[in-house]
């Protein structure tokens, strides 16, 4: 039997999963990665630690599976998006820590571009809004802040890319400097209609094109893993941004299907087919994937920066829980939040507000407020943000989203999913396999390796675990959403 090795490199950990041809998990391994916070608003990773965590978990997963690497037909990679790495081509060593998607250090530069009237050009070419979230300004910052960075980039001494590019470079022993269209579409440097790096955008951010990887289809030939890593050469047959991978893993492969991933952040994506639909409500237009030589497929996306990360803050910052799952027990101890509202804008607000100056806010506290109320308000704060995204997406499409497919670690919380259904007034549908990010990468790698002939052959893979239906009245829902809007207003422009 053939196997697929999925490498899932996320914001807080790296996971490797071995799947069989039926897409059943044979074995897996996971390792946390360290986030560094050198200054307020700055978030970094050690790119070598990321590489070592991926390599070690891959070896561990293969060993646990009791197979040899020769039975692995393909490697599929999925990764945290926007995070950017710059390294020396000769040594393969990073020249600076990776700047993470959550990092806000380039807020002022983005504001200056907006004031100069650049956002229309950027949005038309990339589908994105001028925000420090995306890779271009991070890459520009690195080149400007390392010794001779710009000169070294222009001379061809340096290479750059998102996490997929970095991992493929290391896996292939430096023989393949490549990214896929889904990751490239998040850099703010690729024209999403042509699928090529855009010369005007490279000029805007002062980034030499020679530093960037080749853009490849999501599913196809992205290089070959060097035999020194696993004892045999293995083809890399997919690379895909984590949210697009989850969209594929949920089999949202037809226009109109929608999913939300609850991870470090929350990400709502709706498949729009081969049409790059522009948003009038400050959502993003992004490439979903490209399978082989088929046309590019697109999605509309809303991004929330703080999802599961808000629960981590309860654990690591406030210390009111010892582990993330404890939030459910604590929050279940009260019937509601007691009028407490928590806006988890710790690193600003994403869609549809795009306010890097917003900050985390807790409102409605009284002497009767307890840690349980704060815990419940945190879960509600996550769900309120997703409700904002759904409302914006429905305005864009003019159509009601009747079912929201959910995945990601935090969706294992029945309480959070019930709160989400209540605040949406919609069915929330959770699959049996909630880790659809790695699954999507495995599916795309299998397609690239010819294990399955087409997407239709995968249609029977997905099965539903539970459907959550609303349990509150429309009046209750509207009142809570109205108060949430007031809370968001208080949190905005705090640092302005």
Language model features: what each stretch is:
Residues 1-96, 124, 230-238, 421-428, ...:
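N-terminal glycine/serine-rich phosphate-binding loop of ATP-dependent small-molecule kinases
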Residues 21, 69-73, 97, 209-214, ...:
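Short acidic capping loops at alpha-helix termini that bridge into adjacent secondary structure
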Residues 63-100, 129-135, 168-191, 216, ...:
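Short beta-strand-loop/turn "lid" adjacent to the catalytic site in phosphate-handling enzymes
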Residues 103:
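Carbohydrate-associated surface elements
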């Amino acid at each position: 039997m053939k196997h697929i090795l999925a490498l899932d490199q996320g914001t807080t950990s790296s996971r490797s999963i071995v799947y069989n041809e039926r897409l059943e998990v044979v074995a897996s391994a996971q390792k946390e990665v360290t986030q560094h916070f050198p200054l307020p608003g700055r978030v970094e990773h050690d790119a070598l630690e990321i590489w070592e965590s991926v390599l070690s978990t891959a070896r561990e997963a293969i060993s646990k599976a009791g197979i040899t690497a020769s039975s692995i037909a393909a490697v599929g990679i999925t990764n945290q998006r926007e995070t950017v790495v710059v390294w020396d081509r000769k040594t393969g060593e990073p020249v600076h820590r990776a700047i993470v998607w959550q990092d806000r250090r380039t807020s002022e530069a983005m504001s200056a571009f907006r004031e100069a009237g650049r956002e229309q050009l950027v949005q038309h070419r990339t589908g994105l809004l001028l925000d420090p979230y995306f890779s271009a300004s991070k890459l520009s910052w690195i080149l400007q802040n390392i010794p001779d960075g710009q000169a070294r980039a222009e001379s061809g001494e340096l290479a750059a890319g998102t996490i997929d590019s970095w991992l493929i470079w290391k896996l292939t022993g430096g023989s393949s400097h490549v990214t896929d269209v889904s990751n490239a579409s998040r850099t703010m440097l690729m024209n999403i209609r042509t699928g090529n790096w855009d010369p005007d955008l490279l000029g805007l951010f002062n980034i030499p094109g020679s530093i960037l990887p080749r853009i490849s289809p999501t599913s196809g030939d992205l290089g070959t893993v060097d035999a020194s890593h696993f004892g045999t050469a293995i083809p890399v047959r997919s690379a895909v941004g984590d949210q697009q991978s989850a969209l594929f893993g949920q089999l949202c492969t037809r226009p109109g299907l929608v999913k939300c991933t609850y991870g470090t952040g929350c990400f709502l994506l709706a498949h729009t087919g081969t049409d790059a639909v522009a948003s009038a409500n400050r959502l993003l237009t992004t490439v979903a994937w490209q399978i082989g030589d088929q046309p590019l497929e697109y999605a509309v996306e809303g991004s929330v920066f703080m999802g599961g990360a808000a629960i981590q803050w309860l654990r690591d910052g406030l210390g009111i829980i010892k582990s993330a799952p404890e939030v459910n027990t604590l929050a279940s101890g009260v019937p509601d939040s007691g009028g407490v509202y928590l806006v988890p804008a710790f690193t600003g607000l994403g869609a549809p507000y795009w306010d890097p100056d917003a900050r985390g806010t807790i409102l409605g506290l009284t002497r009767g407020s307890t840690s349980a109320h704060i815990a419940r308000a945190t879960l509600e704060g996550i769900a309120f943000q997703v409700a904002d995204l759904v409302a914006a997406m429905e305005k864009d499409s003019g159509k009601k989203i009747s079912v929201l497919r959910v995945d990601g670690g935090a969706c294992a919380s029945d309480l959070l999913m019930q709160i989400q259904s209540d605040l949406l007034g919609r069915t929330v549908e959770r699959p049996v396999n909630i880790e659809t990010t790695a699954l999507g990468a495995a599916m795309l790698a299998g397609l690239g390796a010819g294990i399955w002939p087409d997407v239709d052959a995968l249609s029977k893979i997905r099965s539903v675990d539970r459907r959550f239906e609303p349990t509150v009245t429309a009046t209750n829902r509207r009142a809570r959403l109205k108060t949430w809007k007031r809370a968001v207003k208080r949190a905005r422009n705090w640092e302005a």
